[in-house]
Design a protein with these regions (language model features):
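C-terminal motif of bacterial Sec signal peptides marking the signal peptidase cleavage site
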Residues: 16-19
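Conserved catalytic region of serine esterases and O-acyltransferases that act on ester linkages
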Residues: 22, 209-263
Length: 263
């Protein structure tokens, strides 16, 4: 009789534990499904500093790898300025009202050489974005050798100017240039530039994506994958970016350092 009672008791305990495990699994699945159903849209407006090495696609797949459903679109033209995009938007609408997040990338020389124009169009765009309850992010671009020579003769560098303009417009500054500066000082063996000493290398694009990921998601980029893939129009697998094994963790850590206090 006692043995029979023990068997019944063990059976009840087993069924209880099994049901608890299934409930937890179901809860986790439900949470993921809810997170995936709700998505937001992000528009990146700019030039080659935005589209080099598939930055928008890399960023979208970074979000997806963390179960953050943000779709990333771009309006980019090589060498373009924000004042040109302002005119393009007026004549060929960018549908900015459809986006929760909008990234503004002015020409790399404008913060130093044409700061009034840079300020004017950052303000125009930000006011327009605010009208539709969007959030503006200012792409804090880096200084390459030519710009470093110019900024050495001025009271502020590119990153400081763009940071100040962001604050004036209640926009969020994305410290990509600060991340570049940190790598150059502390990890000089990591190459951030193409052979023109201006445009970003694949390593630099990965770093840039990590900085954007942190600022937009509010989460640490440490622990993200080092490569991201998608599919082309024929449904075939393509890799958007593959970052070197020996440096991708360093780039994640740098992105964390420059964003942790401001994201």
């Amino acid at each position: 009789m006692e043995h029979r009672f023990n068997r019944i008791l063990y059976t009840i305990i087993f069924l209880f534990l099994f049901s608890c495990q299934n409930t937890k699994k179901a809860d986790r699945t439900d949470i993921k499904e809810v997170e995936k159903i709700t998505f937001k849209k992000m528009l990146m407006i700019g030039n080659s500093f935005t589209f080099y090495w598939n930055l928008p696609q890399v960023l979208e797949t970074m979000f997806d790898s963390s179960n953050i459903n943000i779709k990333v679109d771009q309006k980019t033209i090589g060498g373009s300025k924000l004042k040109e995009h302002w005119e393009y938007n007026k004549h060929k609408s960018y549908n900015i009202e459809d986006y929760e997040f909008v990234v503004l990338n002015d020409h790399s020389t404008y913060p130093l050489n044409n700061v009034d124009t840079c300020s004017k169009y950052l303000n125009l765009f930000t006011n327009y974005i605010n009208k539709y309850n969007g959030q503006t992010f200012v792409y804090g671009t880096w200084e390459y050798p030519y710009l470093k020579k110019i900024s050495s003769l001025k009271p502020s560098n590119t990153m400081q100017i763009l940071d100040s303009l962001s604050k004036l417009n209640n926009a969020k500054y994305v410290p990509v240039g600060n991340a570049f500066e940190y790598v150059e000082k502390n990890h000089p063996h990591i190459n951030l530039f193409m052979d023109d000493n201006k445009h970003p290398s694949p390593n630099a694009t990965y770093l840039t994506a990590c900085v954007f990921y942190s600022m937009i998601s509010g989460k640490s980029p440490v622990g993200l994958p080092r490569r991201f893939q998608g599919k082309n129009i024929d449904g075939k697998k393509i890799y958007y970016i593959i970052t070197e094994k020996n440096i991708y963790k360093t780039l994640q850590e740098v992105a964390e350092i420059v964003t942790i206090d401001i994201r």
